[in-house]
Amino acid sequence: MNRLASTLLLLMSTTFVMGANQISFADELTPAPISQTINQDTIPISRIAEEIGRIRTSGSLPAVMLKWPKAERENFLNFYAARSDLPLWFGGEALNERRDELQRRLSSADDDGMNAEDYPAPFISASETDTRKIAEADLILSASAVSFARDARGARIDTIRLSKLITPKLMLPRPTMVLSDLMGADHVGDRLEAYQPRHKAYQQLKARLMELRETTGSLSDAEPVIIKTTGPKARTTTAMVSMTAPSAFDLIANMERWRWVPPELGADHIFVNLPEFNLKLIRHGEVVHTTRTVVGKPDTATPIFSAAINSIIVNPSWHVPESIIRNEFLPKMAEDPTYAEKSGYEVTQIGENIAIRQPPGERNALGLIKFNLPNEHAVYLHDTPMRKLFANVDRAYSHGCVRVENPFSLAAAVLQDPRYSEEGLKAFVGRDERLIKLIEPLPVHLAYFTVITGEDGQLRRLGDIYGYDGLVLTALKIDQRRNYAALK
């Protein structure tokens, strides 16, 4: 089925919602080529504006707007009211050309792993004189454009419903911003495209998805091939699928998660891809430092969020989190009240509240150095006394924090200060905490991507250690058992 035919079929189910009533107008619209225009000699723009005003004040809304928060729906309607309800997409050759471009972009949403059916783009016959239908079509096109822009920035999924550990700070554009943006753009399609992630990795995923859709005609492509690792460290783990060719569903899930990453990562930043068990320090687009990591176990997963390192502590104390006290310390202390003290911890009790601290030292759970990045999860980067774990292929062992294999080398690369070379930092090791503040906070992004580009330039799939691929696809209502025909 071609895209135009698919869009026309979609139009048959497009409705406006007014209270409890649904007003269908799809079967009254006559399909027409995109290039046709409305006869302005017979339809004054003022009449279309009057109809838009009636629809707006009646409380009728395009169905595509129903998932928006109330404030965003009001913002959308206020935009039209502020311009005297003049249509954005009908009325003159110039507007008609912009409408055609918008329709084409919306109908190709599948290329970005989105669903074109979510962004109806109604077509109106050049001979159409019913101003109500034209007004409805104008509002639907505007609402679809806004929904596309918001979804491109991550609005498709309420991440907190997937997991309380997924807390990206989404930058969702308001309807007024999107529509003003499009009105001022020379090329509407390009401007709408700019709301999609611009990161290189996203573009690689998109290119591969388009290739699969063009060559297979389906999103359920061939069965993946698993190449087992070999050697003394090989074992049946999530790393076993690290050479698996990604399916279209893998691509879509990962493209969606790129929408959770800030549009601008920062000229200098740290990027931690949890399934890759790897950390990269990037300065001006170049990787200047990389190191292995140990991340959270599936039942104590490392959160997905962005924050910034503001200081580094040599010889840190570990203030045991309440969850670890409750789940690990209290059961053992119930058997032996002196368990914590015998293990080298300091226990403070005020009423029914217990605080447990581990003093600095080689046995400290944080190791000899810690990177502070304030966040709601109380998660940070740190050293570890259990360095042997870095030799493993699968490195999901922590309580949620990110353990770094070469922390002093990373700290020196972060600080970029002759006073704090790797050896200089190691000279501070002792019993007393040493706090070093960064001149400028360094952004840190803890992300989750199971499809990456290998050293050979080919995409490969990593283990889905937390099962987020399936959660994302379920949230997007994508059934992997279906055969999704590519729209060509």
Predicted regions and their residues:
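Prokaryotic Sec-type signal peptides and long signal-anchor helices
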Residues: 20, 80-83, 94, 183, ...
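N-terminal, post-cleavage mature segments of outer-membrane
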Residues: 25-129
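Hydrophobic alpha-helical segments and their boundary regions
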Residues: 2-4, 8, 93, 127
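Bacterial N-terminal signal peptides
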Residues: 7-19
